[in-house]
C-alpha cells in the first residue's frame, strides 16, 4: 500500500518520513567559515554561561570578512612584487599600509614579516641646485 516513491511517506501516511539531507549552519548563512566549530569554541571557552544561536553565526561572518580583506590586500601586495604565492611579508605590507587594519593589528607581530620601507625626509638628498638657484635669483632682483 505504498503511495509512491516521491511522496516521502510509507504505508498510506503511516511510518517515518524519509530523512532529509542535513544542511550546515554555515551554508544556511552563506558562509565559508565553520559556524558549528565556532559555536563549540564559544561554549567550551567559558566566555559566558550560555551562548545564543546567532552569536556564532555573527562571529563567523566577522572573521570571514576580516580574513577576506587581509587576503585580498596581501594578494595585491604579492602581485605588486611579481609573486604568485602569499608569504608573511606580503601580509605585513598589506596590514601596515592599510590604516584601519594597522590600527586593529597595531600590537601584533607578524613572524617573518619584516618592516615597512621608510626613509625620513631629512635624510633624503635635497635638490641643491634648484633651491640655491631660486634664492640667488630672488636676491639678484632686489
UniProtKB/Swiss-Prot annotation:
Note the SUPFAM superfamilies from the entry. Answer: Histone-fold (SSF47113)
Q: Where is this motif: [ST]-Q motif?
A: 139-140
The record's subcellular location field reads: Nucleus; Chromosome
> Modified after translation how?
Phosphorylated to form H2AXS139ph (gamma-H2AX) in response to DNA double strand breaks (DSBs) generated by exogenous genotoxic agents and by stalled replication forks, and may also occur during meiotic recombination events. Phosphorylation can extend up to several thousand nucleosomes from the actual site of the DSB and may mark the surrounding chromatin for recruitment of proteins required for DNA damage signaling and repair. Widespread phosphorylation may also serve to amplify the damage signal or aid repair of persistent lesions.
Which tissues does it occur in? Expressed mainly in roots.
Gene Ontology CC: extracellular region; nucleosome; nucleus
Disulfide pairs here are none
Start-end of Gly residues biased regions:
1-12
SMART domains reported for this sequence: H2A (SM00414)
* Domain of life per record: Eukaryota
Pfam families, alphabetized: Histone, Histone_H2A_C
Q: Ribonucleoprotein among the record's keywords?
A: no
Q: Which GO terms describe its molecular function?
A: DNA binding; protein heterodimerization activity; structural constituent of chromatin
Q: What are the alphabetically sorted keywords of the record?
A: Chromosome, DNA-binding, Nucleosome core, Nucleus, Phosphoprotein
List the InterPro entries. Answer: Histone-fold (IPR009072), Histone_H2A (IPR002119), Histone_H2A/H2B/H3 (IPR007125), Histone_H2A_C (IPR032454), Histone_H2A_CS (IPR032458)
In terms of Gene3D superfamilies, this protein maps to:
Histone, subunit A
* Keyword Ribosomal protein carried by entry: no
- Which residues does this entry mark as bearing Phosphoserine? 139
**Which residues does the annotated region (Disordered) include?**
1-28
The record's function comment reads: Variant histone H2A which replaces conventional H2A in a subset of nucleosomes. Nucleosomes wrap and compact DNA into chromatin, limiting DNA accessibility to the cellular machineries which require DNA as a template. Histones thereby play a central role in transcription regulation, DNA repair, DNA replication and chromosomal stability. DNA accessibility is regulated via a complex set of post-translational modifications of histones, also called histone code, and nucleosome remodeling.
**Domain description from the entry?**
The [ST]-Q motif constitutes a recognition sequence for kinases from the PI3/PI4-kinase family.
On subunit structure and binding partners, the annotation says: The nucleosome is a histone octamer containing two molecules each of H2A, H2B, H3 and H4 assembled in one H3-H4 heterotetramer and two H2A-H2B heterodimers. The octamer wraps approximately 147 bp of DNA. Interacts with numerous proteins required for DNA damage signaling and repair when phosphorylated on Ser-139.
| Family of this protein | Belongs to the histone H2A family.
Name under which the protein is recorded: Probable histone H2AXa
Q: Native species of this protein?
A: Arabidopsis thaliana (Mouse-ear cress)
Amino acid at each position: 500500500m505504498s503511495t509512491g516513491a516521491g511522496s516521502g511517506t510509507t504505508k498510506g501516511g503511516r511510518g517515518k518520513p524519509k530523512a532529509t539531507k542535513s544542511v550546515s549552519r554555515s551554508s544556511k548563512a552563506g558562509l565559508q567559515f565553520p559556524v558549528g566549530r565556532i559555536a563549540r569554541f564559544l561554549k567550551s571557552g567559558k566566555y559566558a554561561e550560555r551562548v545564543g544561536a546567532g552569536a556564532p553565526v555573527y562571529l563567523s561572518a566577522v572573521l570571514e570578512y576580516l580574513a577576506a580583506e587581509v587576503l585580498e590586500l596581501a594578494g595585491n601586495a604579492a602581485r605588486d612584487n611579481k609573486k604568485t604565492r602569499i608569504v608573511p611579508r606580503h601580509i605585513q605590507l598589506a596590514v601596515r599600509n592599510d590604516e584601519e587594519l594597522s590600527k586593529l593589528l597595531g600590537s601584533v607581530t607578524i613572524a617573518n614579516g619584516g618592516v615597512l620601507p621608510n626613509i625620513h625626509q631629512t635624510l633624503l638628498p635635497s635638490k641643491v641646485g634648484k633651491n640655491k638657484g631660486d634664492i640667488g635669483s630672488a636676491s639678484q632682483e632686489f
